[in-house]
Amino acid sequence: GQEEINQIMLDNFIIAMDPPKHMKYRKVVRDAFTPKAVGEMEPWLRQHAKDIIDRVAARGECEFVEEVAAELPLMAILEILGVPQKDRKQFFSWTNIMAFADDPDIATSLEEAQAASFEVIAYAMALAAEQRKNPTSTAVQALLNGEVEGEKMSEELFAWMFILIMVGGNESTRTAIAHGMRLLMENPKQLQYLVDHPEDISQAVEEMLRYNTAFIAMRRTATQDVEWNGHNIKKGDKVILHYHAVNHDEDAFGDDAMVFDIHRHKRIPNLRGEIRSFGVGEHFCLGMSLARLEMNIMFEEIIPRLRNAKLAGDTTYMRSYFINTIKAMPITFDPQ
């Protein structure tokens, strides 16, 4: 039943592991996501970002989430995991169903979400067998050959790692790109500033990450009694980490922390170091360098080419207590 499935996920998901087990597993996959490994993908990412905008530029309108925001993160994660690009739409659908089982438009039931995760597990196991015979993906090789305490990674654990990288690696970045675009359209002066000053795009990306974090919250369990800032937290208590709260902290970001401002870095020089969108501590986001690079490249392509972008129709959101996702966001712009 559901209890057993939850337990299997907790046992196998690296985000739910404690030290020292967590670091042993994290090390296995870490090398595929180092700044150096990610940096080598830059030409590939730029070419695909250009192609994505090429596909919509002449039309003067698009559904920004599926046609633009979702494309590059999904393509990149499939490339890293050695999955053929032709399977991309299938993974877009599976990812939505697994991450948003609670949304009636996406999945009709929890069973449907479980079915999607089992399909991905079956796919991952077949991919593992194929990659053992015919290695093309460095990340998959690292996972398959990685050893934890002298034992090779099991196919089952590989499959759970695959799901985590797949969902974590495309859903969150798609959300950050969609929110970033929405914020720029709601602040046309700031958008125009970036058209005129493309060198400031990378700092604008940090403000996007701060202002609308992809993940809403994570939950942790206290392992011992602790007093923190006058609060008594008992062993076994659940502690919720709210990313939006910490990213809007006036002490860190100034009195206008509730305002979206791409110039914030001029007042808060260490903006990048202060934001907690990627978490903090030993569980910090493995894909941080990849997400930042994808966002920078996408906005460097979007901003000069999709001019006078405006919201056209309703922006709809996923029903989720976990991910702050825009489901659909139709926009118009000057045809190119």
Spans of model-derived segments:
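Cytochrome P450
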Residues: G1-Q336
